[in-house]
Amino acid sequence: NQYIEMGILMKRAVITGPTGSIGLALINELVSNGVEVVAVVRPGSRRADRIKTSDMVKRVDCDLSELNKLPELIREGADVFYHFGWDGTFGNSRNNMYGQNLNVKYALDAVEAAFALGCDTFIGAGSQAEYGRYEGSLNESVPAFPENGYGIAKLCAGQMTRIACKQKGMRHIWTRILSIYGPYDGENTMVMSTIYKLLNSEKPSCTKGEQMWDFLYSKDAALAMRLLGEKGTDGRTYCIGSGKARPLKEYIDIIGQNANKNVTIGYGDIPYGPLQVMYL
């Protein structure tokens, strides 16, 4: 592998979980900078057609439970491995403990696959859920006290993959992604569900919207991910966000002004939950 003065010269990257908002934005970001991409897609995924193959983008069908097959499927090897793939990211599945435990195994399998592919660098996608409830600006030095299975598994995956990478002499970078919005965002996210309801002239029901939230556009998140692949420091955790938090109500008001001014937003219709995060 070739190195440049400021970091790795990335020629080819592997991405698991590439069909979401960040994954697709990262594909575009890497290709725009001359990096070939291998997108690892679940067999039978309804979102597989989002991956537009070309001379620069190759699609490989492989389930998270079979990542050990990747070295056979990607004969050309790679330099950087982005592991975004994760089962159970919404609703009750976040507290499916056996399912979340499997995600930790899959993350370790991803390290094994990355090593077999000759990757110098492994970058994992963690979450703000690793912190639990915290009143203040999030950064890598804030203690992590996750309160659901999803956050616990993400924290564990980050720590275990770091040790696994160290054992193999690979650079390890863990990201804690705050709130991302953009094209191909999940239908269950606050931004997308609010937009859909407003476009259908339905009243969105919300909390009071006093939570302080940090939103980042997916294209900007992808830029951060590319730069981490090139220049990120081994062993560090990076929070991926804009660095500026605003009351959630402000974001929702902006959506309302642009999507449908004639619909009243139902602020306060939904009470805060017992484990409500008020600062993200």
Map each language-model feature to its residues:
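NAD(P)-dependent short-chain dehydrogenase/reductase
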Residues: 136, 159-213, 218-227, 254-256
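NAD(P)H-binding glycine-rich loop region in Rossmannoid oxidoreductase-like domains
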Residues: 61-102
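SDR active-site strand-loop-helix element
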Residues: 16, 40, 81-87, 122-128, ...
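N-terminal Rossmann-fold cofactor-binding loop
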Residues: 40-45, 64
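Conserved Rossmann-fold NAD(P)-dependent oxidoreductase catalytic core, especially the SDR/UDP-sugar
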Residues: 87, 108-149
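N-terminal Rossmann NAD(P)H-binding glycine-rich loop of SDR-like oxidoreductase domains
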Residues: 13-33
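C-terminal substrate-binding subdomain of Rossmann-fold SDR/epimerase-dehydratase oxidoreductases
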Residues: 202, 206-280
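Active-site helix of classical SDR
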Residues: 149, 153-156
